[in-house]
Structure formats: structure tokens, C-alpha cells
């Protein structure tokens, strides 16, 4: 209906089809392989862009189509339209913790999941969908109660942000000292990547990062910081810890960058090592002492 209406309004509108997986040449298929139609649009003075439901559009391409192959009929011929992947900076998944810690080691606050680019496809279909399924697809730190019932979803211009309250033990107190554990939430599907045999490719390169801000009780100071790692060639993994004594908060972060969507044997080894470092983050502790 929209296709015909746009054509009547002097737009050039073409219907393409998104398959569940790329199709080999001259291989028969059935109607079940097609996920949905996509419109390719252009008009005088308007650059060509794609319309895929209500998904956010970045540089003329909905995030859902990054790296995909679309198909259409041109007479008796099947034509392919390969959608650019974009840069790894276009596909960013940020998990951010904001935590207040008391002298008993109990913490409370919010954790937010910020999905940009191709990561938006993790979101369930439909505005009123229950996001419990998405949150259940993460490995959460033990000892924390994640309040899924009060999760809030924000629809941004080119992203989604989910904010979830939480509470639980984040530190071990003992006689004026405290051992703070840095919480980390990890998508289960990301960990399964280590089981793939190279070579293989993703739909797009990406960034996964985790950030935390921990506000400590008055009078506490850092005793020492754990060793910080960083480096890589095709897969970069870097960490950061900064203590602000005046404001009593600790900032922590790690960032995993996959620079190319194509993974060969060397990149696979780097990625496997980076994923291990990412999992280790949930075991990192920082000691504090009361002055």
C-alpha cells in the first residue's frame, strides 16, 4: 500500500525482499525463506534510502539491513542489492552501570543497555513487546537482583536504550576495608562465537563496551588497582580504571572492537582471547580502605 502511494506521489519506489540467509545462484527456494519486504526509495532532490518498517535509519540504511543482501525481480532476472556494512563505530553496544555502594557492601542503582546500529536487531519486535526475553539472554553477575519488571525502554533517533534497576551485594566489607567487585553483563550469544571454526563473517564489524561508575561511602580510598590490559591488531581489547578521590567514585570500562566483519584464523584467535578477557572482567576486584 505504501509502495503504491509513494509511486503516485512521484517517488521512485521499488520492492525488494530480505531473505533469512543469502541465496546461492540458481538455487530454488520457497516463500518461507523471505523475512519481509523492504522499500528502496528515491525522489528528486532526495538521496536514495531504504525503508524497513519502523527501524532507525542511519546514513540512508536501516540498522536492520547492515551487511544484508536484498533481492528483487527485474523482468525475468533476479537482481541483488548488497547493503554496506558501515564501520565498527556504527554498531556499538554499550552496557553502563551506575552504582551507589554503602559500608555494608550493598549496592543499588541502574544498568542501561544502549543498542546502536546492527545491535538494534536484538530488540524484540513490536513497541509493547516484553523485553524479559532479551534480558534473559544475558549472563548477569551473581548476587544481584535485576528488576526486569521495572525496566524502561527509550526509543532514540538511531538507537534503543533499556534501563533496569538493580540491587545486591557488590563488595565484601571487613573491618574498615572493602573489596569491590566490578559487575559485568555479557550476552550469551557473544560467548558462543568462540565455538565457530574460521573462516567466517559477521553481518557487520562492531564494538561492545561496558562502563561503570561506583560511588563509595565517605572516607574510603583505593588501596591499589588491578593490572590494566590493552592492545590487539584486528581485535582490540582495552581496559580503564580511574579513581576520583574528591568525589569518591570509581570509573571502570572495557571496550572490545572487532575492526572487520571477516574473521580468519588469526582474527579468530584474537577474538577468542578478547572474549576471555571480557568474561574475566566480572572477576576483577578493587580494594578500598577507610581513612
Language model: regions and residue ranges:
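A sensor for short, sequence-defined functional sites
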Residues: 1-291
Amino acid at each position: 500500500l505504501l509502495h503504491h502511494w509513494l509511486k503516485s506521489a512521484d517517488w521512485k519506489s521499488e520492492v525488494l525482499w530480505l531473505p533469512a540467509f543469502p541465496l546461492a545462484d540458481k538455487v530454488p527456494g520457497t516463500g518461507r525463506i523471505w523475512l519481509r519486504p523492504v522499500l528502496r526509495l528515491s525522489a528528486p532532490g532526495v538521496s536514495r534510502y531504504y525503508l524497513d518498517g519502523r527501524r532507525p535509519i542511519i546514513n540512508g540504511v536501516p540498522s536492520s539491513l547492515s551487511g544484508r543482501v536484498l533481492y528483487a525481480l527485474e523482468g525475468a532476472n533476479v537482481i541483488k542489492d548488497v547493503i554496506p556494512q558501515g564501520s565498527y563505530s556504527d554498531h556499538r553496544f554499550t552496557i553502563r552501570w551506575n552504582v551507589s555502594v554503602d559500608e555494608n557492601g550493598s549496592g543499588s542503582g541502574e544498568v542501561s543497555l544502549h543498542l546502536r546500529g546492527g545491535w538494534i536487531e536484538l530488540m524484540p519486535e513490536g513497541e509493547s513487546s516484553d523485553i524479559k526475553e532479551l534480558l534473559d539472554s544475558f549472563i548477569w553477575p551473581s548476587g544481584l537482583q535485576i528488576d526486569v519488571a521495572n525496566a524502561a525502554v527509550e526509543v532514540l533517533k538511531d538507537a534503543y536504550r533499556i534501563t533496569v534497576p538493580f540491587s545486591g551485594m557488590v563488595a565484601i566489607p571487613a573491618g574498615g576495608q572493602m573489596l569491590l567487585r566490578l559487575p559485568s553483563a555479557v550476552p550469551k550469544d557473544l560467548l558462543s562465537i568462540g565455538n565457530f571454526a574460521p573462516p567466517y563473517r559477521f553481518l557487520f564489524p562492531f564494538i561492545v563496551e561496558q562502563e561503570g561508575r561506583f560511588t563509595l561511602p565517605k572516607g574510603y580510598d583505593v588501596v591499589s588497582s588491578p593490572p590494566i590490559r590493552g592492545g590487539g591488531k584486528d581485535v582490540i581489547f582495552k581496559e580503564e580504571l580511574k579513581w576520583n578521590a574528591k568525589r569518591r567514585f570509581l570509573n571502570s570500562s572495557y571496550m572490545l572492537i572487532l575492526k572487520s566483519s571477516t574473521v580468519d584464523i588469526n582474527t579468530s584467535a584474537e577474538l577468542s582471547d578478547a572474549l576471555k578477557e571480557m568474561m574475566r572482567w566480572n572477576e576483577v576486584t578493587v580494594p578500598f580502605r577507610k581513612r
